UniProtKB/Swiss-Prot annotation:
A biological process from GO: defense response to fungus
Classification via SMART domains: THN (SM00205)
Keyword Disulfide bond: yes
Family statement drawn from the similarity comment of this UniProt entry: Belongs to the thaumatin family.
Keywords: Antimicrobial, Disulfide bond, Fungicide, Plant defense, Protease inhibitor, Serine protease inhibitor
Keyword Disulfide bond: yes
GO molecular function, one term: serine-type endopeptidase inhibitor activity
Source organism (scientific name): Zea mays (Maize)
Any Pfam family the entry gives: Thaumatin
Name of the protein: Alpha-amylase/trypsin inhibitor
Function of the protein: Inhibits both trypsin and alpha-amylase. Inhibits the growth of some plant fungal pathogens.
InterPro entries for this protein: Osmotin/thaumatin-like_sf, Thaumatin, Thaumatin_CS
Length: 206
């Protein structure tokens, strides 16, 4: 699958992509094409902001930093909005979503690209940061309750692993971005599928 990542934000982002792609700077209006093989799983694309890197590609980002390197090999640090995917899985389908489980830094859309007969995908185009609850504000953006409070009921682990429900915080995020994962058991309204072989477009600030 080809993923076209487009920065429509009025500022520079440093796009990141694992396990394929790594990372690169995207000025306003620039795009980046990433080819991911069928069978790729646990994949993420995200935007890093406020980055400074030296000529060797080392430095740091205010949001989404992945260990201080331009070329990410591991996931980014919360808070950051995530575009997630797994290719050619059950029933020959691709599964994809936008997650704000790790918080929110930049609005995204994640849509099928081209004429595969598949047209639905998630959009989280609202600036969640503008109305972020004060206790979730971090680095000028909006974190989720799980990374902030590390409690079972927010993270759906431990005592809440099998009995996890929306919280006031996840309902806030869901109200802002109905398509996005707002808490870990939010699968029903947040996972999208297309036939394997579909190409996709991820737009920052759609």
């Amino acid at each position: 699958a080809v993923f076209t990542v487009v920065n429509q934000c009025p500022f520079t982002v440093w796009a990141a992509s694992v396990p394929v792609g790594g990372g690169r700077q995207l000025n306003r209006g620039e795009s980046w094409r990433i080819t991911a093989p069928a069978g790729t799983t646990a994949a993420r694309i995200w935007a890093r902001t406020g980055c400074q890197f030296d000529a060797s590609g080392r430095g740091s980002c205010r949001t989404g930093d992945c260990g201080g390197v331009v070329q990410c090999t591991g996931y980014g640090r919360a808070p950051n909005t995530l575009a997630e995917y797994a290719l050619k899985q059950f029933n020959n389908l691709d599964f994809f979503d936008i997650s704000i489980l790790d918080g929110f830094n930049v609005p995204y859309s994640f849509l099928p690209d081209g004429g595969s007969g598949c047209s639905r995908g998630p959009r989280c185009a609202v600036d969640v940061n503008a109305r972020c609850p004060a206790e979730l504000r971090q680095d000028g953006v909006c974190n989720n309750a799980c990374p902030v409070f590390k409690k079972d009921e927010y993270c759906c682990v431990g005592s809440a692993a099998n009995n996890c429900h929306p919280t006031n915080y996840s309902r806030y995020f869901k109200g802002q971005c109905p398509d996005a994962y707002s808490y870990p058991k939010d699968d029903a309204t947040s996972t999208f599928t297309c036939p394997a072989g579909t190409n996709y477009k991820v737009v920052f600030c759609p």
